[in-house]
Amino acid sequence: MIIVTGGAGFIGSNIIKALNQGGREDILVVDDLTQGEKFSNLIDCEIWDYWDKQPFLQAIKAGEEFPHPVDAFIHQGACSATTEWNGRYMMENNFYYSKRLLHYCLERRIPFLYASSAAVYGCGLTFQEHREFEAPRNVYGYSKWLFDQYVRRYLPTASSQIVGLRYFNIYGPREAHKGAMASVAYHAHCQLKETGRIKLFEGCDGYEHGEQRRDFVSVADAAAVNLWFLEHPNQSGIFNVGTGQAQTFNEVAQAVLAFHGHGEIEYIPFPDHLRGRYQSFTQADIHALREAGYAEPFALVEKGVKTYLDWLGKNQD
């Protein structure tokens, strides 16, 4: 059995779908469906059981065993809102929760894969998995970074796999429930359908309008990385998950415009509250991931966005 926390969420549900496509259906999904619309992410997924987060966490704290042997934990459950500033809430969901799962797995030698984030790098320009390049600029990034730091203490002596995956800007199917935190591609698609225009920020930090750059990575590629590590339990560490190539917001918008065959871009003023906290440039250094043995190519925006919009047309529009 594989346990996927946050399994009804964006990345978690895509990992479950990928596991299904590989023949795995013995999956225990853990989530909090207070936001009930997330259930739709699991409609076409095959799972063994569903547990609410609270009784699951109580079982973990009590050291209870599960009804079936656990092959791995894939921990995607977290508060992923970069605009959330309730530090107590963020630390409980992203740090303390993760620590409890880590120790449960270490004590039983169960592989533990978890979601980290490119937010740990803050506004820096070097994106390598080393302490000197890490300086988060919001409490979300700090909660992820602090758990990475905690994991680093255990990596040298752990007798079972621990893998932290620092996701860059993920986009793709099953993200509609994320609202304002959904991807640029998703918002561009929705805006174009509703108004015929795509809104992007004006220039900032020395970048021209819409020329801010991010490493946009398909959720299908992120799921594939998770499955690869499941298949290679001798590989442990903290790894960036991105294409390794920054692309502009304009390129994302142009990919959406090209798919629909109409529309235009409207540039709007850059919000004052984001100044000094906004990542105008991200580009994953994926040397560590490649050195670990992951050799699959990553889709760039031109291909990945088209594939995504094809899916939206068949499943949501």
Curated annotation (Swiss-Prot):
Q: Can you tell which superkingdom this protein's organism belongs to?
A: Bacteria
| NADP as UniProt keyword | yes
Q: Which residues bind NADP(+)?
A: 10-11, 31-32, 38, 53, 76-80, 93, 144, 170, 178
Residues at which substrate binds: 169, 180, 187, 201-204, 214, 278
- A single MF term (Gene Ontology): NADP binding
What Enzyme Commission number(s) appear in the record?
Answer: 5.1.3.20
Per UniProt, the keywords (alphabetical) are: Carbohydrate metabolism, Isomerase, NADP
Q: How is the cofactor bound?
A: Binds 1 NADP(+) per subunit.
Quote the pathway field.
Answer: Nucleotide-sugar biosynthesis; ADP-L-glycero-beta-D-manno-heptose biosynthesis; ADP-L-glycero-beta-D-manno-heptose from D-glycero-beta-D-manno-heptose 7-phosphate: step 4/4
Question: Which reaction does this chain catalyze?
Answer: ADP-D-glycero-beta-D-manno-heptose = ADP-L-glycero-beta-D-manno-heptose
Q: Which InterPro entries match?
A: Epimerase_deHydtase (IPR001509), Heptose_epim (IPR011912), NAD(P)-bd_dom_sf (IPR036291)
* GO terms (BP aspect): ADP-L-glycero-beta-D-manno-heptose biosynthetic process; carbohydrate metabolic process
Q: Does the keyword NADP apply?
A: yes
- Cofactors (names): NADP(+)
What is annotated as the active site? 140, 178
The family line of this record is: Belongs to the NAD(P)-dependent epimerase/dehydratase family. HldD subfamily.
Under the heading NCBIfam families, the entry gives:
heptose_epim, PRK11150.1
Its domain comment says: Contains a large N-terminal NADP-binding domain, and a smaller C-terminal substrate-binding domain.
| Subunit structure, interactors included | Homopentamer.
Query: What is known about what this protein does?
Result: Catalyzes the interconversion between ADP-D-glycero-beta-D-manno-heptose and ADP-L-glycero-beta-D-manno-heptose via an epimerization at carbon 6 of the heptose.
**Protein name from the UniProt record:** ADP-L-glycero-D-manno-heptose-6-epimerase
Which species is the source of this protein?
Nitrosococcus oceani (strain ATCC 19707 / BCRC 17464 / JCM 30415 / NCIMB 11848 / C-107)
